[in-house]
């Protein structure tokens, strides 16, 4: 059994910000103590940073740091202090389930299968992508179909080519950023398909990604069917209102159809719709944020509140002794 008064699940932007904020507040409230020893961060990847590690485009930190940073640069603003903080960090460790007795089941190469006891749990586990398979498009499921996150990881982290001619489903920020990335990689983006009557995402991204590179956007439409054996050959695009269809020949389909907060570790809790007061959510697992700066702000407040609750408990115990 591992004991950690404050346990944080997720070492991305939210997890690091919450951990650093909690450590700072504990140092203020419990001077002379080892604040870092009170906090443990679990991360399923080998390094902290989360999705920021695959974001090489600019647009981060405009609010938090008044600087136009890449995702990697934004991450480094926290990764350095986090590494030097003395906060316990367990990489390559997956959180499986939290229990009512304030324990969490985890598994990793350093810990094996173990239980971690905590006083306060901060869930900073981000989101997972809604897959193309969750949609009702007919046809085959050949290779060449990716979620936006998968495509971004393969291009930016693995330096892999995923195709030559792409159609992107979803005009939110992620879809727009991937469209630009494909163009910069020397590929063709034949169309961005959007089910709504207006383009999604931030105006800045629309201007910098779609309008600047003259990428066609087809509104009020969806992908009705997929074609190809072995490799994607094309898609049929259908207008939602008129049902008019158009075939587009392509070898790559990138699906950017939404994010779902990752809360499955809490599946055994909150059966009545309310979570115990010893659990906090922050970042994209709380709700999907438009920018990482607001993720950081919320996470810092969450970490501070958890530290104050822990310090109050410790000081109350000392006064009763």
Predicted segment positions?
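Residues forming the flavin
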Residues: 1-321
């Amino acid at each position: 059994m591992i004991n950690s008064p404050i346990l944080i699940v997720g070492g991305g932007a939210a997890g690091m910000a919450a951990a650093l904020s909690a450590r700072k507040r504990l140092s203020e409230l419990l001077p002379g103590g080892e604040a870092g020893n009170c906090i443990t961060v679990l991360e399923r990847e080998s390094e902290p940073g989360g999705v920021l590690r695959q974001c090489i485009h600019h647009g981060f930190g405009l609010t938090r740091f008044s600087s136009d940073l890449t995702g990697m640069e934004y991450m480094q603003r926290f990764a350095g202090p986090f590494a030097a903080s003395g906060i316990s960090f367990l990489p390559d460790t997956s959180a499986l389930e939290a229990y009512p007795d304030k324990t969490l089941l985890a598994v990793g190469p350093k810990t094996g299968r173990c239980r971690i006891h905590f006083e306060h749990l901060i869930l900073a586990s981000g989101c997972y992508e809604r897959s193309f398979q969750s949609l009702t498009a007919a046809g085959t499921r050949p290779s060449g179909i990716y979620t936006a996150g998968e495509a971004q990881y393969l291009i930016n982290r693995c330096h892999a080519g995923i195709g030559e001619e792409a159609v992107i489903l979803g005009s939110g920020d992620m879809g727009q950023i991937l469209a630009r990335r494909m163009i910069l990689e020397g590929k063709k983006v034949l169309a961005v398909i959007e089910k709504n009557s207006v383009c999604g995402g931030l105006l800045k991204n629309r201007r910098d990604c779609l309008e600047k590179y003259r990428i066609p956007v087809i509104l009020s439409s969806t992908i009705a069917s997929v074609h190809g054996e072995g490799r994607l050959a094309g898609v049929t695009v259908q207008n939602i209102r008129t049902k008019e269809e158009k075939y587009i020949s392509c070898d790559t389909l990138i699906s950017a159809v939404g994010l779902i907060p990752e809360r499955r570790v809490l599946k055994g809790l909150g059966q009545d719709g309310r979570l115990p007061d010893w659990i906090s959510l922050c970042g994209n697992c709380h709700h999907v944020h438009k920018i990482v700066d607001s993720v950081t702000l919320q996470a810092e407040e969450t970490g501070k509140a958890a530290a104050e609750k822990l310090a109050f408990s410790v000081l109350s115990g000392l006064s009763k002794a």
